[in-house]
Swiss-Prot record:
The gene is murB. It is an enzyme of class 1 (oxidoreductase). This is UDP-N-acetylenolpyruvoylglucosamine reductase. It comes from Rickettsia canadensis (strain McKiel). Keywords: Cell cycle, Cell division, Cell shape, Cell wall biogenesis/degradation, Cytoplasm, FAD, Flavoprotein, NADP, Oxidoreductase, Peptidoglycan synthesis. InterPro entries: FAD-bd_PCMH, FAD-bd_PCMH-like_sf, FAD-bd_PCMH_sub1, FAD-bd_PCMH_sub2, MurB, MurB_C, MurB_C_sf, Oxid_FAD_bind_N. Its main location: cytoplasm.
Length: 297
């Protein structure tokens, strides 16, 4: 029998995660936990003597939750982990559940440059740091000084930019880690110019990406050698290809869409079909950028 640690935060059993994801698919969390604060999270982790499986969940923007749901405890950091504050004139500390868009807007309002690209990346600061998210010529590695995190044993840890070991859409951090905060360097700029750049990015996204659809962002990371995943998918003749209720976007081939009745299986099957056909057509193995978690039905 599952015995849950005593916490200040909130537990929910058999919790429907579908409505929290951008794809609007997937099964339930066996246990859903929103900690009250970082000390509450640490207390939960230290009391987890049964070693219940732990899954972390962010904004649900770049993820497929499989139809069988998630075993164990799914942890989502709430509003208390979303603050943005100045440490000093040269550094910001940002909670990991803060949305990228909100940080971009804060920086524009405070004439801080270098964060404009975040307006075009759905998701949270924690998720972006974990995968070194990037767009429009910038990545998280360019702006992060260090992160503060907690491991699954409840130990608080700090990692500098160098220790994080940022790579293209990945890093060298331990797997059993929950990012709590990120510290960023501040470079002053002109508020009007920053806003212009953000508006340019938003206009480009609206023109080239299916942002009004049920999608999960870029499906595959771009392969090495300057190749673009969408070009390889298009070359393989897969623009608009459909499996069940899921399809490859007509507007941008590296996006999958839930047309309204897709299952998680439809989306994952479509992604795997695309990978197989691109490899047969071009000899290139595409790597998933979208995270797939949970059980198959």
């Amino acid at each position: 029998m599952m015995t849950l640690p005593i916490v200040k935060g909130e537990y929910k059993k058999d919790y429907n995660l579908k409505h929290l994801t951008w794809f609007k698919v997937g099964g339930n969390a066996e246990i859903f936990f929103k900690p009250f604060d970082s000390e509450d999270l640490a207390s939960f982790l230290r009391q987890n003597k049964q070693k219940l499986p732990i899954t972390t969940f962010g904004a649900g923007s770049n993820i497929i939750i499989r139809d069988g749901g998630i075993e164990g405890v799914t942890i989502k950091l709430g509003q208390s982990f979303s603050n943005i504050d100045f440490i000093d004139d040269n550094h910001l500390v940002v909670g990991s559940s803060c949305l990228n868009y909100n940080l971009a807007k804060f920086c524009q309002a405070n004439a801080i440059s270098g964060f404009e690209f975040l307006v075009g990346i759905p998701g949270t600061i924690g998720g972006g740091a974990a995968m070194n998210a990037g767009a429009y010529g910038s990545e998280f590695k360019d702006i992060i000084v260090r992160i503060e995190a907690i491991d699954f044993a409840g130990n608080f840890l700090t990692f500098t930019n160098e220790e994080i070991g940022f790579k293209y859409r990945s890093n060298n951090l331990p797997k059993n880690l929950i990012i709590l905060k990120a510290i960023f360097k501040v470079n002053k700029g002109d508020s009007e110019n920053i806003l212009l750049r953000m508006n340019e990015i938003n206009a480009t996204r609206s023109r080239t990406q299916p942002i009004k659809e049920r999608t999960g962002g870029s499906t595959f990371a771009n392969p090495e050698g300057g190749l673009k995943s969408w070009q390889l998918i298009d070359k393989a003749g897969l623009r608009g290809y459909r499996i069940g209720g899921a399809s490859v976007s007509e507007l941008h081939c590296n996006f999958m869409i839930n047309n309204g009745d897709a299952t998680a299986k439809d989306l994952e099957d479509l992604g795997n079909f695309v990978r197989q056909n691109v490899f047969e057509d071009s000899g290139v193995k595409l790597n998933w950028e979208i995270k797939r978690i949970g059980k198959y039905v």
